Amino acid sequence: TATVDCSDYPKPACLLEYMPLCGSDNKTYDNKCSFCNAVVDSNGTLSLSHFGKC
């Protein structure tokens, strides 16, 4: 199972790097930072489906 360490999030701003991740909500996130911020916002209900686009 793919995992991402989001322990040092949320961050106020994300870099514009493009390394897509697919969330359990079937949404493609541009990078780890935007994904982890969404994980924090979801109170831990969002998880990583896989690396790459959904």
Swiss-Prot record:
Q: Which cysteines are joined by disulfide bonds?
A: C6-C36, C14-C33, C22-C54
Q: Which UniProt keywords apply?
A: Disulfide bond, Glycoprotein, Protease inhibitor, Repeat, Secreted, Serine protease inhibitor
Q: Which residues bear the site annotation Reactive bond 3?
A: L16, E17
Output the Gene3D superfamilies linked to this UniProt entry: 3.30.60.30
Q: Which domain of life is it from?
A: Eukaryota
Q: What remark about domains does the record contain?
A: Avian ovomucoid consists of three homologous, tandem Kazal family inhibitory domains.
- The name under which this protein is listed is Ovomucoid
Q: What species was this sequence derived from?
A: Opisthocomus hoazin
Lineage, broadest ranks: Eukaryota, Metazoa, Chordata, Craniata, Vertebrata
